[in-house]
Amino acid sequence: MQEKEASPHGFLPRFQHFATQAIHVGQEPEQWTSQAVVPPISLSTTFKQGAPGQHSGFEYSRSGNPTRNCLEKAVAALDGAKYSLAFASGLAATVTITHLLKAGDQIICMDDVYGGTNRYFRQVATEFGLKISFVDCSKPKLLEAAITPETKLVWIETPTNPSLKMIDIEACAHTVHKHGDIILVVDNTFMSAYFQRPLSLGADICMYSATKYMNGYSDVVMGLVSLNSESLHDRLRFLQNSLGAVPSPIDCYLCNRGLKTLQVRMEKHFENGMAVAQFLESNPQVEKVIYPGLPSHPQHELAKRQCTGCPGMVTFYIKGSLQHAETFLQNLKLFTLAESLGGYESLAELPAIMTHASVPKSDREVLGISDTLIRLSVGLEDKQDLLDDLDQALKAANPPNASSN
């Protein structure tokens, strides 16, 4: 359910009871003999059985862990899902999902995705006999044309990384599901559970690199998967245990703690992200800004129809060349030049050389991932300090007395 009061900038109303669920679901003190209000970190690798083969819910920590169980329950509630599973990383979740398939099956993947996803599908999954097709899934006709009898899974991100292209999840679900037993996976890393619920829009699986916004503190590497299908859950739970790519109890504790501030963090990311996007759009040293919260974004209306807000991810093209982009990045003082995103700190990177370097150059050119495309992860610092930092770095990259390039 969603609240009646509209969110800022014309987006969907916020999901009801989000903060309450994040704080309380799966955290009940009554589940512990100690009545601990904060779920303890269960480091034990094994658990006593009452009799041979008779355990009290846990037997071996890879198969299930009390701390991980608390996290998975909380995430399921925030996604409006029946089930959630935690993995050692976002890519561990991706690998586990693809083990639902067999050699000869086809995966259709959005052409504009995280570089690690692209690399895994292109260079690893194909080695196991999976057929991979990269398609612009923002265009339903192209998605429809790519589906074959061998298609078993469609993988999309929305917004995409790094070009922030929005994809109509409902339209994709309609196209995919009319062909029968095809699984639609939505990578919801950028939006987080706070701004978008893919399952309610028709997706079969919602996945995250929880390393980013869901944890929010840049101190955990983790993946999450949420879903409603009992049969899919049972199979993924079996694969989670069989493949063994599970997170440590300490990481589960940290991510579970991160969820408690997800609402307040995402609101601030939205506020700061919008301010940065508006500042950059008005700056003469910037060629183009891509941010779904701006009216200038090609899918702005879709974003408002599908999401409750926008994260702090802002992409822009700086005027000039690679030299201008590098000079800008090297002169930033608050924004740290680093990969990853979604933490409380602001980060900046050059996708063509960093996060998406593994994507073939010809594909990068088609996707617009040029040497002047810069991706920002806008953090929680004071808004004016961030704007001042961007302003001075842009001036350093294009000094007023320098000849135009």
Curated annotation (Swiss-Prot):
Record function comment: Catalyzes the last step in the trans-sulfuration pathway from methionine to cysteine. Has broad substrate specificity. Converts cystathionine to cysteine, ammonia and 2-oxobutanoate. Converts two cysteine molecules to lanthionine and hydrogen sulfide. Can also accept homocysteine as substrate. Specificity depends on the levels of the endogenous substrates. Generates the endogenous signaling molecule hydrogen sulfide (H2S), and so contributes to the regulation of blood pressure.
Keyword annotations: Amino-acid biosynthesis, Calmodulin-binding, Cysteine biosynthesis, Cytoplasm, Lipid metabolism, Lyase, Pyridoxal phosphate
Stated family: Belongs to the trans-sulfuration enzymes family.
Gene3D superfamilies linked to this entry: Aspartate Aminotransferase, domain 1 (3.90.1150.10), Type I PLP-dependent aspartate aminotransferase-like (Major domain) (3.40.640.10)
A cellular component annotation (GO) from this entry: cytoplasm
Species name: Bos taurus
Keyword check for Cell membrane: no
Recorded catalytic activity of this chain's protein: L,L-cystathionine + H2O = 2-oxobutanoate + L-cysteine + NH4(+)
EC number: 4.4.1.1
Pathway(s): Amino-acid biosynthesis; L-cysteine biosynthesis; L-cysteine from L-homocysteine and L-serine: step 2/2
GO MF annotation list: calmodulin binding; cystathionine gamma-lyase activity; L-cystine L-cysteine-lyase (deaminating); pyridoxal phosphate binding
Record-given protein name: Cystathionine gamma-lyase
Broad EC category: lyase
Cofactor dependency: pyridoxal 5'-phosphate
Binding site for substrate: 62, 114, 119, 339
Matching Pfam families: Cys_Met_Meta_PP
Protein's cellular compartments: Cytoplasm
Residues carrying N6-(pyridoxal phosphate)lysine: 212
An example Gene Ontology biological process: transsulfuration
The protein's assembly and partners: Homotetramer. Interacts with CALM in a calcium-dependent manner.
Matching InterPro entries: Cys/Met-Metab_PyrdxlP-dep_enz, PyrdxlP-dep_Trfase, PyrdxlP-dep_Trfase_major, PyrdxlP-dep_Trfase_small
The keyword Protein biosynthesis appears for this protein: no
PANTHER family documented for this protein: CYSTATHIONINE GAMMA-LYASE, TRANS-SULFURATION ENZYME FAMILY MEMBER
